[in-house]
């Protein structure tokens, strides 16, 4: 959740041919991923999240619900005992921590390599500018691995998997090898979702921090 919150391009002739084929394959991967992402204008799902350290030791397990809507709207609710709500209205992101009775508001960073949640709700038409993308298909599952093209990102790699055309799971790996696995279930796409879903009313008396 934290990763989402803050939590995915003779010998000369042969060489030229290889580069051309590689570029063509990359373009196909980008096109496939873009089509799958843009296919779902809204997504509602439950999720379970597991965070592991580089050695495979479990650091945190959480569950929750999410709703996303293009362009740039998302709502993530992590269940107790580590309850949190993260909401984007397309302009700002509000993080609500009920235990602290504190809301943190910051401007939405629309860069895909800084806000992975926007893969599911943002503008992905220029996704190839942010990531090098490869894909692998196994039966009804399509896996995409996204590696940021710059170093100033929250993660080193992001894997996004689709089953029968719907989002199935995501995995983020950061610079120290920590892995965050998110499995979605009960996925519903292209349902009517009112924009009011993404308006968070801060409780009276709560601390408000604006960044």
Swiss-Prot record:
Gene3D superfamilies: Lipoprotein localisation LolA/LolB/LppX (2.50.20.10). It is found in: Periplasm. The keyword Signal applies. This is Outer-membrane lipoprotein carrier protein. Coiled coil: none annotated. The keyword Coiled coil does not apply. Participates in the translocation of lipoproteins from the inner membrane to the outer membrane. Only forms a complex with a lipoprotein if the residue after the N-terminal Cys is not an aspartate (The Asp acts as a targeting signal to indicate that the lipoprotein should stay in the inner membrane). Its main location: periplasm. Pfam families: LolA (PF03548). GO terms for cellular component: outer membrane-bounded periplasmic space. GO terms for biological process: lipoprotein localization to outer membrane; lipoprotein transport. Belongs to the LolA family. The gene is lolA. It comes from Pseudomonas putida (strain W619). Monomer. InterPro entries: LolA/LolB/LppX, OM_lipoprot_carrier_LolA-like, OM_lipoprot_carrier_LolA_Pbac. Residues 1-25 form the signal peptide. Keywords: Chaperone, Periplasm, Protein transport, Signal, Transport.
